[in-house]
């Protein structure tokens, strides 16, 4: 409890401390880590094939008084039909590569690293890629002043085939007598259905709908360590991050049974801003033999904001063009949110007493004020 108290009320669920990889004194080191592999579904759920479904249909049709379907008179002359799970899921390739270059001398250390992850989704049409870069640098300007900078940048892209499990549910519920594609290449959908239940083609859902994100993240931190006198260390930090989040969604015109869906495109852009300015001083001293004291006092200011903008249009003449400008301007809807700026200012302190390297006493204080 004492260890987390220094971080205030927001540490009620615990604190995760992240340390960055730094260069070591000596010659430059080049390190590479990577792998390639494949992913696949470990198991498929048991569902009815076409002969089993036809037999079930005939029993229910007899009870409901529908009459048998001509093509279901002898179910076991039928093929197995469509196994939608095996149509929807695939063996997916993935690769991950990371390179790090680090080094330094007694007064300077550096570390540069880059990574790339490319992961095809087990579900067709889905996937994830991430490119990242990180740089850490610190130097001793004098024997009492050290400065440094840490930066990290990443770009992630994701194709989202499965939203709220709709495609998976459709694959489990869709009838095995529906073909994934018709002979002319179009997607198969049920046009007549005595159950009065219609499911879209999950292969169509995965391939034709656009649902993707493209996000950028930048984190930065600059710091200075000042040692004006023996035992006293003053650290000043300024840092923050910027996040750019872009969403793209498009649904083409399609219909099945009595259901008709109009084409629609939606675009969204979001920006997050976070800043932090922290200063704290730590003083270590030994007033008596086997007695060690440490006193730390600090101040931190944090502030940020969130902005968002989105737009949508319907009535596209072509499914090949997803730009908002290509939609019917009469159906345009827009929304924006400049967000609510927020800020937190904090003062904190900690006292540590060590007797004989055996008995420890710690006291922590912190106060926060927020906008």
Where are these regions (language model features)?
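Outer-membrane beta-barrel channels and translocator barrels
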Residues: 25, 94, 105-106, 142, ...
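Transmembrane beta-strand segments that form the barrel wall of outer-membrane beta-barrel proteins
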Residues: 34, 114-120, 361-369
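Outer-membrane beta-barrel initiation region
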Residues: 44, 87-91, 101-105
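A generic beta-sheet turn/junction motif
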Residues: 11, 103-107, 116, 355, ...
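Surface-exposed loop/interface segments of Gram-negative outer-membrane beta-barrel transport/assembly proteins
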Residues: 24-81, 121-128, 132-217, 235-345
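Membrane-embedded beta-strands of outer-membrane beta-barrel proteins
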Residues: 16, 99, 133-135, 220-222, ...
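Repeated loop/turn-to-beta-strand initiation elements of outer-membrane beta-barrel proteins
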Residues: 107-110, 144-147, 231-234, 291, ...
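A beta-strand signature from Gram-negative outer-membrane beta-barrel systems
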Residues: 1-31, 94-96, 109, 115-117
């Amino acid at each position: 409890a004492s260890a987390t108290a220094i971080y205030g009320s927001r540490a009620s669920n615990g604190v995760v401390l992240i340390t960055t990889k730094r260069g070591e004194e000596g010659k430059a080191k080049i390190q590479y880590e990577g792998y390639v592999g494949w992913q696949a579904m470990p198991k498929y759920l048991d569902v009815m094939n076409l002969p089993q479904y036809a037999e079930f249909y005939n029993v229910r049709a007899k009870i409901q008084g529908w009459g048998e379907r001509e093509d279901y008179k002898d179910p076991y002359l039928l093929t197995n039909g469509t196994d939608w799970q095996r149509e929807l899921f695939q063996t997916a390739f993935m690769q991950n590569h990371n390179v790090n270059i680090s080094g330094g001398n007694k007064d300077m250390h550096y570390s540069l690293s880059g990574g790339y992850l490319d992961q095809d989704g087990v579900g067709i049409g889905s996937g994830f890629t991430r490119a990242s870069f990180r740089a850490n640098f610190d130097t001793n300007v004098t024997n009492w002043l050290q400065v440094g900078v840490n930066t990290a940048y990443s770009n992630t892209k994701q194709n989202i085939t499965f939203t709220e499990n709709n495609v998976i549910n459709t694959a489990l519920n869709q009838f095995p007598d529906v073909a994934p594609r018709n002979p002319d290449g179009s997607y198969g959908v049920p046009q007549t259905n005595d159950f009065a239940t219609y499911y879209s083609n999950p292969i169509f859902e995965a391939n034709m709908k656009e649902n993707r994100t493209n996000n950028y993240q930048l984190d930065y931190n600059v710091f200075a360590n000042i040692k004006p006198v023996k035992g006293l260390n003053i650290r000043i930090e300024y840092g923050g991050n910027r996040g750019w989040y872009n969403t793209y969604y498009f649904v083409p015109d399609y219909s099945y049974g009595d259901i008709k869906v109009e084409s629609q495109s939606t675009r969204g852009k979001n920006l997050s801003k976070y800043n932090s300015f922290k200063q704290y001083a730590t003083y270590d001293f030994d007033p008596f033999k086997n007695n060690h004291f440490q006193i730390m006092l600090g101040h931190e200011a944090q502030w940020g904001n969130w902005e968002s903008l989105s737009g949508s249009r319907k009535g596209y003449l072509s499914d090949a063009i997803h730009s908002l400008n290509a939609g019917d301007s009469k159906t345009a809807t827009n929304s924006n949110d400049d967000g609510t700026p927020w800020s937190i200012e904090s003062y904190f302190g900690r006292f540590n007493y060590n007797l004989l390297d055996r008995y420890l006493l710690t006291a922590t204080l912190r106060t926060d004020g927020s906008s």
